[in-house]
UniProtKB/Swiss-Prot annotation:
EC number: 2.2.1.2
Record protein name field: Transaldolase
Subunit structure: Homodimer.
This protein's encoding gene: tal
Classification of source organism: Bacteria, Pseudomonadati, Pseudomonadota, Betaproteobacteria, Burkholderiales
Statement: the UniProt record of this protein carries the keyword Transferase: yes
Length: 317
């Protein structure tokens, strides 16, 4: 029997969402994504501790920020040895509201990859989908530096990223699901509120439809999954980035997977363009309590994990 994972690959490019690159080979993903939390999780494992220790040792006397950048590139280059496609490396979340410093950091990361023999076409720079992050992506894209816009929870963020010419967006599914499930509390009914009705699934479907309807070339990569149902409900999305745990579940399943998203259906939808000047962007984002709260929370969590990683490095110096 064909596995659910192999069926999914017929409709969607499968991406591995992990810093634990030793798990990549068995799932044969096209691309891979990382973030500060995943790198922090990886370097706490015995298998990856030597990479951290070597990076600190090789750059003794340099700043902690300098060492972290080299650590991200060390993980990225190892990941690229195991996949045919691209790796996403994230700009420090503490720069989420600083356009110029985000631009500078994106350029620096690409230079480090190129110095390691990796072409920029194999790297995506991850930026938070704040107004400032989107403006940074607009500049970097014009320079041939491709960007992956993360912490994306709303259509207005997606529309702004597309207008800025971002290579790819990562609309989150699981974190939207978490928010609505918490809001409903005891009234949440998984059978009724999950599956095709899952608010996170519906958000990505809405964004995908908007992009294909208006002919945007920005790729849509669903992210942040809690269940395999959320994944299979988005079969047909351009890409889906999936944790090793859920990749394993899909690999072990022979449940039928049908295409759920289609560019042809999206083109026939009746939609209006979203206004995306700065004031409209900020108002629409502010008007969406879920997106506002999850964006702020995501930046806080990634920033906190960056601080934890800095402390680990300090302890080794």
């Amino acid at each position: 029997m064909t596995t659910a994972l192999d069926q999914l690959k017929q409709y969607t490019t499968v991406v591995a969402d992990t810093g634990d690159f030793q798990q990549l080979a068995q799932y044969k993903p096209q691309d891979a994504t990382t973030n500060p939390s995943l790198i922090l999780k990886a370097v706490q494992k015995d298998a990856y501790r030597p990479i951290l220790e070597k990076t600190v040792r090789d750059h003794a006397g340099e700043s902690v920020g300098f060492i972290i950048d080299r650590l991200l590139i060390a993980f990225g280059t190892e990941i690229l040895k195991l996949i045919p496609g691209r790796v996403s490396t994230e700009v420090d979340a503490r720069l989420s509201f600083d356009t110029q410093r985000s631009i500078d950091k994106g350029r620096e990361i690409i230079k480090l990859y190129e110095a390691a023999g990796v072409g920029r076409e194999r790297v995506l720079i991850k930026l938070a989908s704040t107004w400032e992050g989107i403006r940074a992506a607009e500049v970097l894209q014009r320079e041939g530096i491709r960007c992956n816009m993360t912490l994306l929870f709303s259509l207005v963020q997606a529309a702004a990223c597309a207008e800025a010419g971002a290579q790819l967006i990562s609309p989150f599914v699981g974190r939207i699901y978490d928010w609505y499930k918490k809001q409903k509390g005891a009234d949440w009914d998984e059978a009724q509120d999950g599956g095709a009705n899952d608010p996170g699934v519906q958000s990505v479907r809405r964004i995908y439809t908007y992009y294909k309807h208006f002919g945007y070339r920005t790729e849509v990569m669903g992210a942040s999954f809690r269940t395999t149902s959320q994944i299979t409900e988005l079969a047909g999305c351009d890409l889906l980035t999936i944790s090793p745990e859920l990749l394993q579940k899909l690999h072990d399943s022979t449940e039928a997977v049908a295409r759920k998203l289609s560019p042809d259906e999206a083109r026939d939808a009746r939609l209006e363009r979203v206004a995306i000047d700065e004031s409209s962007f900020r108002f629409q984002l502010n008007d969406d309590a879920m997106a506002t709260e999850k964006l702020a929370e995501g930046i806080r969590l990634f920033s906190a994990d960056a601080v934890k990683l800095e402390k680990m490095i300090e302890a080794l110096r």
